[in-house]
UniProtKB/Swiss-Prot annotation:
UniProt organism field: Bacillus subtilis (strain 168)
GO CC annotation: plasma membrane
Name of the protein in question: Probable membrane transporter protein YtnM
Transmembrane segments: 4-24, 33-53, 76-96, 102-122, 139-159, 206-226, 231-251, 260-280
Statement: the UniProt record of this protein carries the keyword NADP: no
One Pfam family from the record: TauE
InterPro entries registered for this protein in UniProt: TM_pro_TauE-like (IPR002781), TSUP/Inactive_protease-like (IPR051598)
PANTHER family with a match to the protein in the record: MEMBRANE TRANSPORTER PROTEIN MJ0441-RELATED, MEMBRANE TRANSPORTER PROTEIN YTNM-RELATED
Compartments in which it is found: Cell membrane
Membrane topology: Multi-pass membrane protein
Keyword rRNA-binding: no
Length: 300
């Protein structure tokens, strides 16, 4: 029972983060599940099963509020679904003990990318004439992001969100809505790949329902939270958290000398704290709390 409550909290925390940033539900929840000793394939399968429900709810909400660029969604869902299915089949064939440290390394690198992006490259997009993706851009982007999402348990948001933010004409809210809406197809495709490769018997449905419950509870809270807190600060906090969780797995797997473990954790914590303080100095204490009006004014 205690583990189910913990998994529900993991789902809640992950959805709060994803609903605020448009990324990191899969990365956060998979990282925490791996920390509990769950094999990479089962962890990723559980997360994607839960995401079928959470991404559907998120997508409907974004469509309702006009936060979706439908053309971009159509361009990404087919190549993304193919990549997710192939990634799920690939991960399912790897032995859990062999794959775990490498998946943690991949997630740690994604966490580092999220942290660096929000630390140094955060620039709210301005509304300009929309320049859509062409096939040479959308197909490789969808396949790579879908494959990364299935193999790492997360990656659709961290890969697609910064690419779309760099495009002209898509405001941050539309980027988040487009990524979240298209992720439903990715979750369905990855789930199909896992169920075909792993079978139903390896899935713990109580874990899945716990993750779903936490995510459903967090969805409206996240919608409120994204209007209140500065996204740059949230991004740095999330990136550092992902690094710390996955660093624990890598340290335990690859560094036998336990005497140096506290030193490594201290160094990671110090760097993370420095990054948070740096962001606070950039945005100013008065700008930590953002209102919906402030955000929408920047987008227009």
């Amino acid at each position: 029972m205690k583990k189910l409550i913990v998994f529900a909290f993991i789902g809640l925390l992950s959805q709060l983060i994803d609903g605020s940033l448009g990324m990191a539900y899969g990365v956060t929840s998979t990282s925490l599940l791996l920390a509990f000793g769950i094999t990479p394939a089962v962890a990723s399968a559980s997360v994607h099963l839960a995401e079928v429900v959470t991404t559907a709810a998120s997508g409907v909400s974004h469509i309702k509020f006009g936060n979706v660029d439908k053309q971009t969604v159509y361009q990404l869902v087919i190549p993304g679904s193919i990549g997710a299915f192939l990634g799920a089949a690939f991960l399912s064939q790897l032995p859990g003990d062999v794959a775990k440290p490498y998946i943690s390394l991949f997630l740690l690198l994604l966490g580092g990318y999220v942290l660096i992006r929000f630390l140094f490259q955060y620039k709210p997009a301005l509304e300009k004439k929309h320049v859509p993706l062409n096939r040479k851009q959308s197909i490789p982007l969808g396949v790579i992001a879908g494959f990364a999402d299935a193999t790492g348990g997360g990656g659709w948001g961290p890969v697609t969100t910064p690419i779309l933010l760099s495009r002209k004409g898509l405001s941050p809210r539309k980027v988040v809505g487009t990524v979240d809406t298209s992720e439903f197809a990715i979750a369905v495709s990855a789930t199909a790949g896992f169920l075909i490769s792993l079978g139903w018997e390896d899935v713990n449905w109580l874990w899945v329902f716990s993750l779903m419950a936490g995510g459903i509870i967090a969805a409206p809270i996240a919608a409120w939270l994204v209007q209140k807190f500065h996204p740059q600060l949230m991004g740095v906090l999330v990136g550092g958290f992902i690094i710390l969780v996955n660093a624990r797995t890598l340290i335990n797997e690859w560094i036998a000398n336990t005497a140096v473990h506290p030193l490594i954790y201290t160094a990671i914590g110090a760097i993370w704290l420095s990054a948070v303080l740096f962001v606070l100095s950039k945005i100013g204490n008065r700008n930590i709390v953002k209102t919906a009006v402030d955000v929408h004014l920047k987008e227009k």
